[in-house]
Structure formats: C-alpha cells, structure tokens
C-alpha cells in the first residue's frame, strides 16, 4: 500500500477576480500588529494592517449552504501615514483629498469600514506560475455611481478591543501573522499555546 503525497487538490479552485474596475465597499480591518519582515536581505519591524473590501456586484457561491456572497479582495499595508507611505497615498486617493498635518498625526482607519470606493484590479503572475488578483489603485466612486450596501458582516480586529471569536474565524494564514506580532504576544504573554 502506498502513501501518496500530492498537491492540495481537495481545495476547490475559485476563479480569480477578473482584471478591471469595481465598485467596492470596505468591510474588514484587521490589525495584524508589529511583525518582522525581510526585504532585500534587510530585516525590519513594521506595524501592519489588512484591509478587505467586498465587491457587491460580483457575487459567487463559495458554499452551497450560504448561497451567493460577494467576492472579496484585501491589501496589507504598513500602518503609517508618513508622507511617503503607501497607506497614506492609498487613503488620500480613496478619500479624494490630502491629509492635513493634524489628520495625519492620528487617523483611525477603522472609520473607513463601510465606505465605498472604486478599486482597480490587475493580475500578476508569481514566480511559481500562479496568477493573483491585486489592487493596483483606489479612488472615490465616480459621481452618480452607486455601490450596494454592505453585505458581509463588519469586521474590526484591534488590540485595544481584541475579539477572540473574530480572531478564530479568520483564515489560518492571517492568524499565523497575527500570533507572530509583538502585540499579540504581549496580549497572550501568560500562555504559550497556539490558538488554532
């Protein structure tokens, strides 16, 4: 009898979101926390946030029991509003205006949950040959264009008000990042247990 190792073929293949422009609505902000990243051989600690949007005009059935649901797409950012930060430029484009110096000192990104926008999605092929949908840009919705109301339940995970139930409902790859953060480790310093 053989024990065969295969690629994970039990996972249902879902077609990637076609490239194009979409009305979208933010429904999730996950504070990943401060994690170590290595880029070009240099390691740095960065505080990260994951922002997720639903595309309410792009419905798909992921699970027969739940029926049609909107497709979703996410982007991870370093949580910084420095004038050269990616997040700042992205949010200014979404809001349609620049941050004032006062706003940039302390802006609660969770205020954008439920706010509609226009997302441009492009495709990129990774070195492993897989093609992924990526958010290339954001803008305010064009004048006169509507975006349906939020369909997914609002998700907000912060260390100020850590919701264990929400954390446990996240995909494993996100939880793995969260548990590596300084903030999570500080929150759970009395236990060495991996929560999933």
Task: Tell where the protein language model's regions lie, with residue ranges.
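Short beta-rich binding modules
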Residues: 1-196
């Amino acid at each position: 009898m053989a024990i065969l190792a295969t690629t994970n073929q039990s996972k249902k293949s879902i077609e990637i979101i076609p490239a194009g422009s979409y009305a979208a609505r933010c429904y999730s902000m996950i504070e990943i926390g401060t994690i170590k990243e290595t880029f070009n051989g240099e390691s740095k600690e960065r505080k990260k946030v994951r922002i997720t949007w639903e595309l309410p005009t792009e419905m798909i059935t992921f699970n027969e029991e739940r029926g049609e649901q909107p497709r979703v797409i996410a982007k991870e950012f370093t949580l910084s509003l420095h004038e050269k930060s990616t997040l700042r430029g992205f949010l200014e484009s979404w809001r349609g205006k620049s941050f004032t110096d006062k706003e940039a000192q302390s802006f609660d990104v969770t205020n954008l949950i439920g706010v509609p926008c226009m997302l441009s999605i492009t495709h990129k092929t990774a070195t492993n040959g897989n093609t992924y949908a990526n958010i290339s840009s954001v803008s305010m919705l064009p004048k006169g264009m509507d975006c349906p109301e939020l369909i997914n339940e609002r998700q907000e995970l912060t260390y100020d008000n850590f919701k264990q139930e929400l954390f446990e409902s996240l995909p494993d790859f996100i939880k793995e990042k969260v548990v590596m953060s300084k903030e999570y480790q500080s929150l759970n310093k009395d236990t060495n247990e991996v929560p999933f």
